[in-house]
Amino acid sequence: MKAFVLFLREVESTHQPAIDAMISAKAYGLDAEMFEGYTPSRADEYIKRENLKPYFPGPKLYKIKWNKGGVRGCMISHLEMWKKCVELDETVVILEHDSVVVSDTWKTPFDQLLHLDKHRFVDPDPDLDKESNVEKLEHYRKGQQQLQGTYGYVVKPETAKRLIRGAYEEGLTAADMFVKDLYCNIQVVTPRAVKVNNQESLTSNRDFYI
């Protein structure tokens, strides 16, 4: 299975971690390659060019998130990876530069979209050494089931199509809030296949804009 590892060409600190993520993915059987993402300024150009709009359903959290340049860059980067998934017509694994693949449970059969880390920031994995299992992801914000981070998930082409359609019809928000039960059945695998190496993110930096 192909895997995309998101990095930013303009941000050197993402380069080596992304290479390490790619190496870890290959070690567990993935056909991994680097995928150049969008900085805030290029994301803003993309949003304008594609006539996209933000999704503001009411809660202030959505506007607070969308005002961060890193959030917009991350969302457009994932949108482009979904488009690549559809173009290839293949199920793909999507990783970010600070991801580390730690097992091959990404191979476990699932319905539409599979999150690869049930216990974010918890190490060691509480499910380590157990039989692989897929279950509904129980993570909710603002009354919606959403992804808990976008650093590691598997997406099928039909699901990617629905996510793309939602981006153009409903609007954009932070990528992990955008991926929700409105568009797909979100499941999670245990033990984890991916962990995140860094609790700090460019999406949380209000001053990140290049």
Per-region residue spans from a language model:
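An acidic/histidine-cluster motif and surrounding catalytic segment
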Residues: 1-95, 99-210
